């Protein structure tokens, strides 16, 4: 396929409104299709309702209520939360504190429900704290520190003091380095390569008039012990 692809990963100003402004700029520039990773699902859904019906749209993330989206591509957020809980249980943790940002989106909320339900089944005490990643806070001793957003996971790793009590979400280069160094005990991940590849194929297929089904990606738990072994290394480092 001969496709002109442009990546826009940073926004000026407040990220939620700025993403909607960037989306509007794309369709006003007569872009044929977009792949979106939602920052603020409610705002983005409202923006998409104004988009021309000819715009092919694929969303990497949870469903946007009321938006006309050709295809959603995402792991199951609740299952990802359960997998993270299983890692906490397997490590013998008896209590945990879950850190959610004030702007936590729908995916983080669903991960939280999956996590807490599984932990309560095993009678593991779970406290929830609302705090933004850039705020000044310290991790409590003797409890697992859990994040359900990549930015918050990074914030916990920065405050971990080298312990292995942080459990989080994401597979950025920095987070994988923190995992290898022992600043994180486990990370719930999906294949970002698959997400990107399938989202582009979906937009192309929509432009060719093909109806697309939503795609559910597998999610996994990466640890320092398995991150360089097959198949986890293929998931985390698909191009190497």
Predicted regions located by residue number:
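Hydrophobic alpha-helical
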Residues: 23, 33-53, 115, 129-178
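Hinge/cleft segment of the Venus flytrap/periplasmic-binding protein
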Residues: 119, 194-240
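Hydrophobic alpha-helical segments within soluble ligand-binding/sensing domains
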Residues: 72-97, 171-175, 190-208
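Flexible loop/hinge segments that line or gate small-molecule binding clefts
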Residues: 41-79, 172-181, 185
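Short, solvent-exposed amphipathic alpha-helices that sit
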Residues: 1, 18, 80-84, 106-126, ...
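Short, high-confidence coil segments that cap the C-terminus of an alpha-helix
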Residues: 31, 93-94, 141-143, 184
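Short beta-strand elements in bilobed, periplasmic/extracellular small-molecule ligand-binding domains
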Residues: 1-14, 97-100, 116-137, 144
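Exported/periplasmic ABC-transporter solute-binding proteins
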Residues: 150, 158-193, 201, 209-218
């Amino acid at each position: 396929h001969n496709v002109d692809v442009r990546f826009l990963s940073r926004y000026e100003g407040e990220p939620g409104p700025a993403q909607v402004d960037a989306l509007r700029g794309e369709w006003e520039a007569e872009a044929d299709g977009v792949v979106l990773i939602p920052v603020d699902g409610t705002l983005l859904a409202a923006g998409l309702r104004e988009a021309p019906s000819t715009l092919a749209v694929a969303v990497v993330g949870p469903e946007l209520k009321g938006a006309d989206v050709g295809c959603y591509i995402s792991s199951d957020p609740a299952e990802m939360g359960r997998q993270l809980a299983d890692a906490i249980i397997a490590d013998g943790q008896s209590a945990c504190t879950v850190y959610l940002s004030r702007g936590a989106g729908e995916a983080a909320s669903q991960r939280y429900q999956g996590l807490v339900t599984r932990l309560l089944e095993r009678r593991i005490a779970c406290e929830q704290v609302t705090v933004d990643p850039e705020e000044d806070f310290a991790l409590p001793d003797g409890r697992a520190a859990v994040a359900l957003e990549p930015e918050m996971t990074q914030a916990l790793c920065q405050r971990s003091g080298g312990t292995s009590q942080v459990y989080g979400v994401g597979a950025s280069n920095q987070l994988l380095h923190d995992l290898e160094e022992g600043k994180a005990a486990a990370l719930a991940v999906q294949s970002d390569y698959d997400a990107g590849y399938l989202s582009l194929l979906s937009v192309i297929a929509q432009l060719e008039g093909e109806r697309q089904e939503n795609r559910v990606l597998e999610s996994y738990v990466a640890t320092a012990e398995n991150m360089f072994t097959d198949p986890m290394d293929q998931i985390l480092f698909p191009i190497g």
